[in-house]
């Protein structure tokens, strides 16, 4: 993956972007990994994020997620999260396997490194965003 490390110096992140970020301490404890993560930005500061039966709702409106395959949706019980000011809610696209904000909370703006703009591996997934 290639990420634009400068974009968030000038622009606010947008919902749906794939973001590289420094892992918060809770993520290191819950996921057993540290350093950086790559996840999709789902919730913006002030949003209420609810996941019910594999569907995500932002402020009680269904979020269109054409990038999530039906077999990758998580069927956990309903979860509700309020995104604090200056923080972002991240989720992986493979919801059943992803260790993300549902497990360890939101990500502070200062932890955002950049937006992914190109994928070059594996070769069958080469794309520009």
Where are these regions (language model features)?
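Soluble "head" domains of membrane/secretory-pathway proteins
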Residues: 1-129
């Amino acid at each position: 993956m290639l990420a634009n490390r400068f974009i968030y110096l000038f622009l606010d992140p947008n919902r749906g972007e794939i973001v590289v970020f420094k892992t918060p301490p809770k993520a290191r404890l819950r996921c057993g990994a540290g350093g950086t993560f790559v996840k999709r930005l789902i919730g913006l500061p002030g949003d209420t994020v609810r996941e019910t039966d594999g569907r995500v709702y932002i402020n009680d409106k269904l979020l269109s997620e054409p990038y999530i395959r039906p077999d990758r949706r998580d069927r956990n019980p309903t979860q509700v999260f309020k995104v604090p000011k200056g923080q972002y809610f991240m989720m992986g696209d493979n919801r059943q396997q992803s260790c993300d904000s549902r497990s360890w909370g939101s990500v502070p703006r200062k932890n955002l490194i950049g937006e992914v703009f190109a994928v070059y591996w594996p070769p069958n997934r080469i794309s520009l965003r």
